[in-house]
Amino acid sequence: MAKPLTDQEKRRQISIRGIVGVENVAELKKGFNRHLHFTLVKDRNVATPRDYFFALAHTVRDHLVGRWIRTQQYYYEKCPKRVYYLSLEFYMGRTLQNTMINLGLQNACDEAIYQLGLDMEELEEIEEDAGLGNGGLGRLAACFLDSMATLGLAAYGYGIRYEYGIFNQKIRDGWQIEEADDWLRHGNPWEKARPEFMLPVHFYGRVEHTEAGTKWTDTQVVLALPYDTPVPGYLNNTVNTMRLWSARAPNDFNLRDFNVGDYIQAVLDRNLAENISRVLYPNDNFFEGKELRLKQEYFVVAATLQDVIRRFKASKFDSSNSTKTAFDAFPDQVAIQLNDTHPSLAIPELMRIFVDIEKLPWSKAWEITQKTFAYTNHTVLPEALERWPVELVEKLLPRHLQIIYEINQKHLDKIAALFPKDVDRLRRMSLIEEEGGKRINMAHLCIVGSHAVNGVAKIHSDIVKTQVFKDFSELEPDKFQNKTNGITPRRWLLLCNPGLAELIAEKIGEDYVKDLSQLTKLNSFLGDDIFLREISNVKQENKLKFSQFLEKEYKVKINPSSMFDVQVKRIHEYKRQLLNCLHVVTMYNRIKKDPKKLFVPRTVIIGGKAAPGYYMAKLIIKLITSVAEVVNNDPVVGSKLKLIFLENYRVSLAEKVIPATDLSEQISTAGTEASGTGNMKFMLNGALTIGTMDGANVEMAEEAGEENLFIFGMRIEDVAALDKKGYEAKEYYEALPELKLAIDQIDKGFFSPKQPDLFKDLVNMLFYHDRFKVFADYEAYVKCQEKVSQLYMNPKAWNIMVLKNIAASGKFSSDRTIKEYARDIWNMEPSDIKISLSSDPSGGANKANGK
């Protein structure tokens, strides 16, 4: 049960969390009881904790509704340019606490729930994560929605309402087992179905060329039913919309065309159409060319573009004008951002609408299309790039294939004119790859069809320009940009680490929440011993809290005064959880060799999901759990070293582990992690980073000073040089006794005595086809880890470094990222107007910092 706050604690919780007025609390209690009674049809005698959660969620939602309606009215009145963020993933996590914070209701709700005799934290834990994403790409989309609303941009997130999100991970006998994530089982209080905006989406069929133009006919129709979720900005009364599409079979499905009397079977077959939005594909950084996935990609695109055009035509903007000239204004009113290539079919689909339906000439349609779209690239791993078989696209989307061919022809004509006789260049730059079966290179389609292409960190954008899409950036250098990723400080500081957020606010005020660059002001407190101790105390409280959580949920006991060394992210060879694992084995061997020697106690925590079909990633999990089994049960080791595999890592678990972390592991092979955003979350929450010069680590080192991160290992040039020379893993194995010992133990069954050859495939990979060169960085990594332990023994020096990192993390707010997208790509202006809640039709508004 929550304890009441003392007056001092209440004073410390400055208005970051909202003012608590008596009438405010009474109003919330009234709303809560009303919903319990009228919405849930329960009284306090029979209500369950879940009922209480839903009553609270509906009460908080009531405070969103007026602002939501008002925001949409305001956009209609003012007719600003709108941005549409298209993504197959939105990894939102939980909504309740984020909504309370952004509406300034958290303290009042806490008080109301306390007065009702309930425990706020217990209620928050009941909410299911909306796990509609795999990892970084989907979570980035969620952070971006928060920032776009906070910056007052007229923005819409468009995606799919998957019935089943990312699988729940269970560990059984050390192996990952997947379970379906039935996240909607109890209902979702935040969404509103909008059947009145249901739209048809077409598949298959054939193309007819007639006098009147081209027609796509004899198609199968699936209906797209939109569900809207409110996205509140931080204390600015703006509430934007995330619209997710659900697939529905039309009522005449399988009945109209061949009514052979099997009515029951026809109704049962409706499932086939509705499977489109059934489940999220659980691949991170890997392309799997399945027909159902292609259907998902087209489904979201086709429904969204109809909606965008409907809204454009209904807007007050130039509504007197006739269609043809009206579409000239389309790119002035609409920006569409493609989150990776997954929604790339939006390019041929918009062309199809303009040319076949709106009857625009090709050149005009293409000009508008290019001005409308922009593309974000998220990965340079070749196995992740989408390349759809022509044959599959021809079957599913015959008209789109024709349009893609036409786009390609005009594109290649242009190149041939610029580079006559350079046949190889034509082959490299074509949208169609010929070798090994014809495939469409979706990244090439996005580059050609967009006016801007961006990478997600400086180093990644450089690789995109100079290596992956070199030919394209030589052709149009101005098209290529960098937009370093960011994270929302609302969720990733205020929500998950209120103690630290309040400590910072006491020193520099509250404005940093909307302008994270103000964190540099903390540098003036580097000499303030009391402040350093307070920061350290907050970390210790978070570690204690997380230890208690681990003990309660996972039945694991850990030493809260040990260093918490954490690597949480998708399990992938390029992220090198194996390198971390080898370090754990090495520490274990050192303790065993000399148990009396001083050893800085560590709890190593590794968490993350492996794609269900990714054999090596699953074997890596089994290795981690097997090493943990040995290390954690060795009496000689005791509490000096523990290895925990954190089961079912997800957004709500990240919010618990990140504030408790001392050391953040960001150890991908240089040149493989596009940006990373977990690295930023740890930095903002007072962890130090051990990492390679990869992704955003490079810019973190630039902001904080390289001496304030633990940087080790090969740089991008070193990796290239090693590739050129030829990477021989055996050489490192022979030269480094501790590495040899660790590998031999894994190989000979020390960690799997019942199955001595359990890890032979893994060891074989490390020796003969390790693309990510684990052995090459082993020695530097272990040495760097020794430096970490050294510093940890000097708490004051450690805390100074922590404060320097927090003070340098301001650049990594997604607010900064979105301002750059708005300025450099979308041609939109953020607004600090606070929408007024009176519904006076003039769209009355005032500055957010005033009334």
Curated annotation (Swiss-Prot):
Allosterically regulated through the non-covalent binding of metabolites, being activated by AMP and inhibited by ATP, ADP, and glucose-6-phosphate. The activity is also controlled by post-translational modifications including phosphorylation and acetylation. Acetylation, which is up-regulated by glucose and insulin and down-regulated by glucagon, inhibits the glycogen phosphorylase activity by promoting PPP1R3B-mediated recruitment of phosphatase PP1 and Ser-15 dephosphorylation. Phosphorylation at Ser-15 converts inactive phosphorylase b into active phosphorylase a. Dephosphorylation of Ser-15 by phosphatase PP1 inactivates the enzyme. AMP binds at residues 43-45, 76, 310. The modification N6-succinyllysine is found at residue 364. Its main location: cytoplasm. Keywords: Acetylation, Allosteric enzyme, Carbohydrate metabolism, Cytoplasm, Glycogen metabolism, Glycosyltransferase, Nucleotide-binding, Phosphoprotein, Pyridoxal phosphate, Transferase. It is found in: Cytoplasm, Cytosol. It catalyses: [(1->4)-alpha-D-glucosyl](n) + phosphate = [(1->4)-alpha-D-glucosyl](n-1) + alpha-D-glucose 1-phosphate. The modification N-acetylalanine is found at residue 2. SUPFAM superfamilies: UDP-Glycosyltransferase/glycogen phosphorylase. The modification N6-acetyllysine is found at residues 470, 796. GO terms for cellular component: cytoplasm; cytosol. One of its GO terms (molecular function) is pyridoxal phosphate binding. It comes from the Eukaryota. The record marks 109, 143 as: Involved in the association of subunits. The modification N6-(pyridoxal phosphate)lysine is found at residue 681. The record marks 156 as: May be involved in allosteric control. GO terms for biological process: glycogen catabolic process. Allosteric enzyme that catalyzes the rate-limiting step in glycogen catabolism, the phosphorolytic cleavage of glycogen to produce glucose-1-phosphate, and plays a central role in maintaining cellular and organismal glucose homeostasis. This is Glycogen phosphorylase, liver form. It comes from Bos taurus.
